[in-house]
UniProtKB/Swiss-Prot annotation:
May regulate plasma membrane ATPase activity. This is Proton pump-interactor 3B. It is a single-pass membrane protein. Residues 34-63, 369-395 are annotated as: Disordered. It comes from Arabidopsis thaliana. One of its GO terms (cellular component) is plasma membrane. Keywords: Cell membrane, Coiled coil, Endoplasmic reticulum, Membrane, Transmembrane, Transmembrane helix. The gene is PPI3B. The lineage of its organism: Eukaryota, Viridiplantae, Streptophyta, Embryophyta, Tracheophyta. The chain crosses the membrane at residues 555-575.
Length: 576
């Protein structure tokens, strides 16, 4: 095919001034006549002609313009939440692997200890068996010697004893015969003669056999002690072996738990990746579209490729215009790739002048933030950061004066300072929020406690009021009953009651006069200009009214006051 096909994907196609050089570069990399080559940075695809070696010369000679087609590319979107969860799960898997390695190393050490204990026990077991064989042989010799001694004792006399128990038994029998039995004088003389007979040969044999028995007993004791020491060592080693085996079982259980935990995290990562792939369904669909377009470009079918590209663009634009969610998803996907390629949201290259302008502003902010942070924490580092900032600004002023405009990013030190300052601010804000939340909770708790106390106090007051009202009602009824009884019983008051009432009236009148005189002595010059109108009533009650009064019984009031006091004391005790 004479025409060249340029297949472009991305947000915007920018025509290059040196397209022939690009075609030459791409055609050198092609392997076959109809092979498709890709440039990932520029997202372009070129298809070759008949021969790869003479393609550039033919294009230069012919001067045919290449055909370009536009297809929208859906980039991969890595959800930060899913990415954070996957990173966290990977960290947990790394920790599980570290724990598994530690458990395996501990298990290896325990197994080595078990093997060493087994070797020690294997070396001690034959020694113990040899000592047991020696003990058995010694016991046989000892038994033969004891039998020989017993035979000698039986041949000579029955009175020869080799043990303390036999001697005690014989002495007991002799004492019993002396106390309860009857022995003649001849027999006693014969027993004395038998004891006084000299028998040197038999006694020497007995002494030799006794010495051999003693030596055999000492040898047996030594062998037994050695055997006991070996058995103690074997028991100690068996205890250590049992402990190490228990430790190995515990480590196996811990290893199984760690592996189970790791498998859970692997399953979680798998689910998160499936979720991420579901979110990137548009990207996989765009991959299939791109593969189909590459096949069409490789085959050289321009008409079908043009129809396919236009249909894909129309489909994308309909989705862009109709579906808001699709539009937001595409913007979210394309923003990261635009930042990497230094493009604006509309696909154009960022202006260098604006970049330099923003670069001039950013270091000043970083220096201010660094100065604030270092004033609070480090005063020395603030001066160093300010000097670095001044040097950077001077360099950037010189670069703006030069002909070639170069984009320079702020230095890492300033970025680190900004990140540290932001982290400290965030931490302070979080601490302040936590403090405010704690204060709010404390105030709410105090309010709730105060409300509960007030509520309890009100309930107690209500109970007291109810008790007092019931008591007063009861006492009023008692008074009414007493008054009715007194009115029925007494028709006229007694003389004693009249005398008491007269004395009360006199005391009241005397006290009123004394008060009036005291007030005059204290305030002699004060005179009131108001006229005092006296009432028509008398100060002292007449005798006729006094005679009409009923006699009150004071024992009723005493009982009522005592009952009220008792009820109040009971209420106070119940509240406590």
């Amino acid at each position: 095919m004479d025409e060249q096909i340029i297949f472009c994907d991305g947000f915007e196609v920018v025509p290059s001034p040196e397209i022939n050089d690009l075609i030459l570069y791409e055609c050198d990399q092609s392997l076959t006549n109809s092979e498709v080559t890709t440039d990932e940075e520029e997202d372009t695809i070129f298809s070759g002609g008949d021969s790869s070696s003479g393609l550039a010369a033919e294009e230069d000679s012919s001067g045919d313009k290449p055909l370009s087609f536009y297809i929208v590319k859906q980039p991969v979107y890595d959800n930060p939440e899913i990415k954070a969860k996957i990173d966290e799960a990977n960290q947990e898997i790394f920790r599980c692997n570290e724990l598994r390695i530690n458990v395996l190393s501990a298990k290896k050490s325990e197994l080595a200890e078990v093997s060493s204990l087994y070797t020690q026990m294997e070396s001690l077991v034959p020694q113990s068996e040899g000592y047991r064989m020696v003990i058995e042989e010694k016991k046989k010799e000892f038994d033969t010697l004891l039998e020989a001694l017993r035979n000698l004792r039986c041949t000579t006399s029955d009175q020869l004893c080799f043990t303390k128990e036999e001697l005690d038994h014989l002495s007991y029998i002799a004492q019993y015969q002396i106390e309860y039995g009857s022995i003649g004088l001849e027999e006693e003389d014969w027993m004395l003669k038998e004891t006084e007979k000299p028998d040197g040969i038999i006694l020497s044999e007995k002494e030799a056999s006794i010495n051999r028995v003693k030596s055999m007993a000492l040898e047996l004791n030594e062998v037994k002690n050695e055997l006991d020491a070996i058995t103690w060592k074997i028991n100690d080693l068996s205890d250590k072996l049992w402990k190490s085996q228990n430790n190995i079982r515990v480590l196996d259980l811990e290893k199984a738990h760690i592996l189970e935990k790791r498998d859970r995290f692997y399953a979680r990562i798998k689910m998160l990746r499936i979720q991420r792939d579901k979110g990137n369904a548009a990207f996989f669909q765009s991959l299939s579209v791109m593969c189909k377009a590459k096949e069409l470009a490789a085959s050289g079918n321009v008409r079908e490729l043009e129809v396919f590209a236009s249909s894909e663009v129309d489909r994308f634009m309909t989705l862009w215009n109709d579906d808001k969610a699709f539009r937001e998803d595409y913007v979210r996907r394309i923003s990261h790739s635009l930042c990497e390629r230094e493009l604006n949201e509309d696909g154009r290259i960022k202006d260098a002048d604006l970049q330099i302008f923003w670069e001039k502003k950013v270091p000043v902010k970083t220096i201010k933030r660094s100065e604030k942070v270092h004033k609070m924490n480090r005063e020395d580092s603030s001066s160093n950061s300010s000097e670095d900032g001044n040097v950077i600004t001077d360099k950037r002023k010189k670069e703006t004066k030069s002909d070639v405009i170069v984009y320079e990013k702020p230095k890492k030190k300033e970025e680190e300072i900004d990140e540290e300052a932001l982290k400290e601010r965030k931490r302070e804000e979080q601490l302040e929020k936590a403090r405010l939340v704690m204060e709010r909770k404390r105030k709410l708790q105090e309010k709730a406690a105060a409300k509960a106390a007030i509520r309890a106090q009100k309930e107690a007051e209500k109970k007291l009021k109810a008790i007092i009202l019931s008591c007063s009602h009861f006492f009023n009824e008692c008074e009414k009953k007493a008054k009715k009884k007194a009115a029925a019983n007494s028709t006229s008051p007694s003389e004693s009651d009249q005398v008491i009432n007269d004395e009360k009236v006199r005391t009241l009148a005397v006290s009123g006069k004394e008060k009036h005189q005291k007030e005059r002595l204290l305030f002699p010059k004060q005179r009131s200009f108001r006229y005092k109108h006296r009432g028509s009533g008398t100060e002292a009650l007449p005798k006729a009214i006094l005679n009409r009064r009923k006699a009150r019984r004071y024992w009723v009031w005493g009982l009522s006051s005592a009952a009220l006091a008792v009820s109040l004391v009971l209420v106070v005790l119940l509240l406590r």
